[in-house]
Every structure is written in structure tokens, then in C-alpha cells.
Amino acid sequence: MQTPKLIRPTLLSMAIVSSMAWATGASAALVPPKGYDAPIEKMKTGDHNFTCEAIPKPYTDKLVFRSKYEGSDKARATLNAVSEEAFRDATKDITTLERGVSKVVMQYMRDGRPEQLDCALNMMTTWAKADALESREFNHTGKSMRKWALGSMSSAYLRLKFSDSHPLANRQQDAQIIEAWFSKLADQVVSDWSNLPLEKINNHSYWAAWSVMSTAVVTNRKDLFDWAVKEFKVAANQVDKDGYLPNEMKRRQRALSYHNYALPPLAMIASFAQANGVDLRPENNGALKRLGDRVLAGVKDPASFAEHNGEKQDMTDLKKDPKFAWLEPYCSLYTCSPDVLEDKHEKQPFKTFRLGGDLTKVYDPTHEKGDKGDNDGS
């Protein structure tokens, strides 16, 4: 029989084709979700009142700051006004940079003025050339500031890098300086937040993973992408069968707020993973959806959280619309119910500097309503 001779090369060719397809897929450049390719709205010329704010002094000192929960017990749920003021003073230049980059990139994507692009890039290159935020001397609050800052800047920069208007085409030297700096910071963030015991893995680790995911796409580094996905899976497997995060339940009266605060980085990571062919929604039997549903139910009626940990919930933070910016990526991953969509539309646009600015512009541009909303992310 001649059949086996015919089958053998056919199987071999199939294997070769399969391996070539795998190699092509493996080497495909990392990309953000679709909305990040949006072009600049208008290329405005002529008179303008844009002023580039003074660039804050690059922070090159050790990353050791007081915690705003200083003196609180293990629950870390009681703010210390004195230490919070000290923390905000010490980190002012860092948060000024975060907010500034996010704000100016949003303005540039709206107006397209060269001065705005110059401003945003100068802010980042100034800090990059100073090796800012790279200190190996840090405490928990310090390494937290590093990952927040990286996430804020890299996710704003995504808008420039992937826009169909190609604003960085003639700014490659600046781009290389900025991206090399982001890459170094991401390596340090991975080091800062790796190999923690499960009882220490909470929203901070999720935000660290978001900063690394955003930087992975900016720098096209699959190793960073894989680390962020791995951290997401750890987070997903912390969500219990009822949608609670046990480590955030420890935050007593702030448990619901911290569950809500855990959602933005997780929803963004899942959205970015999806854009690159990795579906994280099934992880731990749909953990992200379970967590989102639990938080949305808790916002409507916080009694379930109070019953679960014995504490009446502090709803102060949950009255701020930008705290629900996670609904943009979340409702792109899942079919949100009509009442959730109605609530989302009432709160839009969602502008939060820790996620790179205006997420409504990226995920739901038909519901963009101009300048409504504070670029809040604190």
C-alpha cells in the first residue's frame, strides 16, 4: 500500500505549517485594545491659550514615604491625617507628573497642537534622563508609588504610540528614551512585587500588574505581558465563590471600597490580554465577573459586605464617578445589564490618570461628553 508514504509527508507538512503559524503568533507585536488607535480629533492651528506647566523636579531620592494609614492596626482602614499630609507633600512631584502627563496627552489627542506633544514628551524625557523613580531603597509605600507612576505614564503614552495619527513618527529619539526608562521601571516593579505570600497579595499587586501590562504593550515585551497575566491569575484565584476578596475584606469599613479599587487594574489587564488573544474571563470559573457583580450589588446595597465582615461600610469613595472607570473595560469584556449601562452612561466620561486618562474615549467614544469629569485617580 502506498497510502502511508503519502500520509507521512502530509503530516510532516502539517506540522511545519503548524509550527510556522505558532512562531508567527508568538512573535506578533503586542497591541492595546482597539480604541487606542484613535486618531487625533482635530489638528488645530493658530492662536491658543495652552501653557505647559513647569516640569516637576525628577524624583531621584530613595522611595521611602510615610503611609497615610500610619498607626492603624492590621486592617489598614483608619486614615492618619498627619501622616497623609506628609505623604502627599513628599510625593507631590510624582503625582504632579502623573496627572500632568495624563492631562496633556488628553489635550493633545483632542487638539493636536505640537506644543502639547512637546510638553508631554519633555515631562517624560526629563524624568527618564534623570533615572527618576529607580531607587532600590524603598518601603511599601515607596514601591507602591513607583508602580502607580509607571502605570499612569505608560498608559497615557499608549495613546501616542498606537494612534493612527502616528504622533511619534518624528520623535523617535524621545520615544526610545521614554520606552527604555519604562522598561527599566517595569523590571523593578516585577522585582518589587514578585514572590509575595498569598496573604500579602492584594490590590497593590493588581495595580503593579496593570503597570507592567501597560508597559509590556508599550515596549513589546512578552516577558512583562506574561508576568502580568500570571499575577492576574493569582488575583482571580483569590476571588471566593461569592465574589469576595478575603484580603480586601480585612479592610473593615473600607472593604467595599477596596473591592471596587481592585477592579480597575484587573479589568484593564483582562482587556489588554484579550486584545492579544488571551482570554482571562474563564479564570477561576469567571472570577472577574463574579467580583464585578459583587461590587455592583454592594454599591446598591452594602449590607452584604457589612454582614460578611461585621462592619458598616464607608461609602465616601464610592460617591466619586471616576472610581467606576473599570466599567469601561469591564463592559467591553461582558454584556453589562441595561441598568449597569444606564449608570455607566450617567457617570461618563471616565477620566482617571492612573489608567492613562479618558477611558470613555477609548472604550465607548459614542458616549464621550467632552470635559465633564475630573481626571481623578487618587
Curated annotation (Swiss-Prot):
<dbReference type="GO" id="GO:0042122">
    <property type="term" value="P:alginic acid catabolic process"/>
</dbReference>
<feature type="binding site">
    <location>
        <position position="258"/>
    </location>
    <ligand>
        <name>substrate</name>
    </ligand>
</feature>
<keyword id="KW-0574">Periplasm</keyword>
<feature type="binding site">
    <location>
        <begin position="67"/>
        <end position="68"/>
    </location>
    <ligand>
        <name>substrate</name>
    </ligand>
</feature>
<comment type="similarity">
    <text>Belongs to the polysaccharide lyase 5 family.</text>
</comment>
<dbReference type="InterPro" id="IPR008929">
    <property type="entry name" value="Chondroitin_lyas"/>
</dbReference>
<dbReference type="Pfam" id="PF05426">
    <property type="entry name" value="Alginate_lyase"/>
</dbReference>
<keyword id="KW-0456">Lyase</keyword>
<dbReference type="InterPro" id="IPR008397">
    <property type="entry name" value="Alginate_lyase_dom"/>
</dbReference>
<dbReference type="GO" id="GO:0045135">
    <property type="term" value="F:poly(beta-D-mannuronate) lyase activity"/>
</dbReference>
<dbReference type="InterPro" id="IPR022859">
    <property type="entry name" value="Alginate_lyase"/>
</dbReference>
<protein>
    <recommendedName>
        <fullName>Alginate lyase</fullName>
        <ecNumber>4.2.2.3</ecNumber>
    </recommendedName>
</protein>
<feature type="binding site">
    <location>
        <begin position="140"/>
        <end position="141"/>
    </location>
    <ligand>
        <name>substrate</name>
    </ligand>
</feature>
<dbReference type="GO" id="GO:0042597">
    <property type="term" value="C:periplasmic space"/>
</dbReference>
<keyword id="KW-0732">Signal</keyword>
<comment type="function">
    <text>Catalyzes the depolymerization of alginate by cleaving the beta-1,4 glycosidic bond between two adjacent sugar residues via a beta-elimination mechanism. May serve to degrade mislocalized alginate that is trapped in the periplasmic space.</text>
</comment>
<feature type="signal peptide">
    <location>
        <begin position="1"/>
        <end position="28"/>
    </location>
</feature>
